């Protein structure tokens, strides 16, 4: 299947070899796959209407059937479809996917602040469990203290939704406070996106750790490769894990594959992304919390 198979190249193999304990020594606990949840994946196909403002657009398809097959091959019971940035606020393809596998999937939508409550309720009925603020790559940060945003955030809280934040760590100190003030639960993507040069010493990442005391912030252990090239992101992940554990507890951490690893298809694949969690968390009891208990509750699979 050429690119659609998303095979990892030699560079990805080198990254794993750089990390301790990678030589096939870590195995998944028996039975854990029965209820495991992948909390971060995207589906799309060529020909869909693209957002007017976008950083990129893939030149291949990543369909629902592709994703469900990937889950099956890796023993993952459930998945969460996150609206891709390049599709903007047109969530129709993602919603169609949710309706085809209602018991197995949940969704995270991207919406405008003036989206009618009735439309949000329809999304909720389809399996949407939250909204995403994809602000990475220099996108302007909205005024989340403003009335339109406060209304949206309040409605999200009323629905029991989470708000997922994707932004470089340096800006988290000005983004997270108004969101927490609105009363919603927050999920921060990809280890909080610390600066590759600073790693866990990034002041924004340190601020993220402080929000653990709120008990309303979760962090995705996902896409470490987006936080630094040539293995730097993976090394930052290893350094971040004990800090995140201490600040949030295992019950506020989740794993996501980030499939189909857009813009990194040649250096990572699904199996490698899943194995990274075994490296980060060699304790099977901790992995069960991250893979099963926490996402099952937060995404309302139970």
Identify the residue ranges that each predicted region occupies.
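Mid-to-C-terminal alpha-helical segments outside catalytic/metal-binding sites
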Residues: 5-18, 23-35, 60-78, 243, ...
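Hydrophobic faces of well-ordered beta-strands that scaffold small-molecule active sites
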Residues: 37-41, 80-81, 107-109, 131-133, ...
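Conserved, mostly hydrophobic/aromatic
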Residues: 40, 71, 94, 156, ...
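Alpha-helical scaffold segments that flank or form the walls of functional sites
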Residues: 54-82, 87-100
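Active-site gating/metal-coordination segments in enzymes
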Residues: 88-170, 177, 220-224, 231
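Catalytic pocket-lining loop regions of alpha/beta-barrel enzymes
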Residues: 145-254
């Amino acid at each position: 299947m050429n690119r659609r198979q998303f095979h990892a190249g030699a560079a990805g193999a080198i990254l794993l070899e750089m990390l301790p304990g990678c030589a096939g020594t870590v195995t998944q606990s028996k039975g854990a796959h029965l209820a495991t949840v992948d909390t971060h994946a995207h589906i799309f196909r060529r020909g869909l209407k693209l957002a007017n403002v976008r950083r990129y657009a893939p030149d291949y398809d990543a369909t629902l059937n592709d994703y469900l097959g990937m889950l099956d091959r890796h023993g993952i019971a459930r998945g969460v479809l996150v609206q891709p940035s390049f599709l903007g606020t047109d969530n129709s393809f993602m919603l169609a996917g949710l309706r085809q596998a209602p018991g197995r999937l949940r969704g995270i939508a991207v919406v405008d602040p003036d989206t009618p409550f009735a439309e949000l309720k329809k999304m909720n009925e389809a399996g949407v469990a939250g909204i995403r603020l994809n602000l990475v790559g220099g996108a302007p940060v909205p005024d989340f203290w403003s009335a339109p945003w406060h209304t949206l955030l309040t409605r999200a809280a009323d629905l029991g939704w989470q708000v997922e934040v994707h932004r470089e760590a340096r800006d988290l100190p000005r983004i997270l406070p108004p969101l927490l003030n609105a009363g919603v639960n927050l999920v921060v993507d990809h280890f909080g996106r610390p600066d590759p040069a600073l790693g866990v010493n990034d002041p924004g990442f340190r601020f993220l750790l402080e929000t653990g005391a709120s008990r309303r912030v979760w962090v995705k252990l996902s896409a470490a490769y987006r936080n630094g090239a040539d293995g730097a992101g993976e090394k930052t992940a290893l350094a971040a894990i004990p800090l995140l554990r201490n600040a949030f507890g295992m019950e506020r951490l989740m794993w996501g594959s980030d499939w189909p690893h857009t813009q990194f298809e040649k250096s990572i694949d699904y199996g490698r992304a899943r194995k990274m969690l075994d490296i980060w968390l060699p304790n099977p009891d901790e992995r069960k919390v991250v893979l099963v208990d926490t996402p099952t509750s937060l995404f309302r699979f139970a």
